[in-house]
Amino acid sequence: MATTSTTTKLSVLCCSFISSPLVDSPPSLAFFSPIPRFLTVRIATSFRSSSRFPATKIRKSSLAAVMFPENSVLSDVCAFGVTSIVAFSCLGFWGEIGKRGIFDQKLIRKLVHINIGLVFMLCWPLFSSGIQGALFASLVPGLNIVRMLLLGLGVYHDEGTIKSMSRHGDRRELLKGPLYYVLSITSACIYYWKSSPIAIAVICNLCAGDGMADIVGRRFGTEKLPYNKNKSFAGSIGMATAGFLASVAYMYYFASFGYIEDSGGMILRFLVISIASALVESLPISTDIDDNLTISLTSALAGFLLF
């Protein structure tokens, strides 16, 4: 009887110890820290839209790039700093290339056109997924808008930047195409953000598509379009191909973080949007207005209709 009583008491003590919380346990760290409500909602939404990702995988991958999950404001401030350094380093690099005359000015301008927007979008996972993250991220191209205005108006002078972003080295050109380019990227960032494939379509067709259209068209564009002698079949095909491939690449990139769902249907929609953007870019009206505007608006409208 004594043995049975002792065993019973030990069992009760063990159960009590196991079920009771450890008061002195250290606070949780890293990605298991409390996160803002809007981050949790966004992650849950991403999970429900995709059956390919287990819940734990999406939660960890969605937060993997966020620097301080327990403090979204601090995390977004740091992300803004890192992205600004990356973006302006790219601009500085191409500006120096333009100043030294290493490449043809037209080629440098298009390389900047391709590079800046795509590099900026690579940094989006560093920001939180709500409107706060979108606003902090949009400050990066927003600062560039101010920079374009100051350069274009002649408030200050930067020969390298002007050469790398203008057709003929005239500072006033920055108030047209380059300014529309940055405005389009900023608008896509704020309005659509990283959970929308429309943002991918707009930026990829604007940057990769339009940039490659000019490069390919100048090199292989001997066969001109019948309705626009300033455009070529090679340039239009190059634009549609580059915009489409970049869109698919970023689809898989954002899907790896759980922001969107990669699928064959989405790939097909990206193809349609890239073809539509290339067709509009080839029209004479795109030259009269500005292809940075027409491509962005076409991609956004087609994306709105398809997604």
Curated annotation (Swiss-Prot):
Q: What upregulates this protein? A: Down-regulated by abscisic acid.
Tell me which positions the record assigns to the signal sequence: none
Q: GO: which molecular function terms?
A: ATP:farnesol kinase activity; ATP:geraniol kinase activity; ATP:geranylgeraniol kinase activity; CTP:farnesol kinase activity; geraniol kinase activity; geranylgeraniol kinase activity; kinase activity
Q: How does it sit in the membrane?
A: Multi-pass membrane protein
Q: What is its EC number?
A: 2.7.1.216
According to UniProt, the reaction catalysed is:
(2E,6E)-farnesol + CTP = (2E,6E)-farnesyl phosphate + CDP + H(+); (2E,6E)-farnesol + ATP = (2E,6E)-farnesyl phosphate + ADP + H(+); (2E)-geraniol + ATP = (2E)-geranyl phosphate + ADP + H(+); (2E,6E,10E)-geranylgeraniol + ATP = (2E,6E,10E)-geranylgeranyl phosphate + ADP + H(+)
GO cellular component annotations, sorted alphabetically?
chloroplast membrane
User: Transit peptide positions?
Assistant: 1-65
Chain ranges passing through the membrane? 77-97, 116-136, 137-157, 177-194, 197-217, 237-257, 265-285
- Disrupted-gene phenotype: Increased sensitivity to abscisic acid.
Keywords on this record? Chloroplast, Kinase, Membrane, Plastid, Transferase, Transit peptide, Transmembrane, Transmembrane helix
Biological process per Gene Ontology, one example term: isoprenoid metabolic process
Coiled-coil-forming residues are: none
Where in or outside the cell it occurs: the entry states: Plastid, Chloroplast membrane
Q: Which InterPro entries did the record assign?
A: Phytol/farnesol_kinase
Can you tell me which family this protein belongs to?
Belongs to the polyprenol kinase family.
**Job description of the protein:** Kinase involved in negative regulation of abscisic acid (ABA) signaling. Substrate preference is farnesol > geraniol > geranylgeraniol, but has no activity with farnesyl phosphate. Can use CTP > ATP > GTP = UTP as phosphoryl donor.
Question: What's the protein called, per UniProt?
Answer: Farnesol kinase, chloroplastic
Q: What's the source species for this entry? A: Arabidopsis thaliana
Q: Which gene encodes it?
A: FOLK
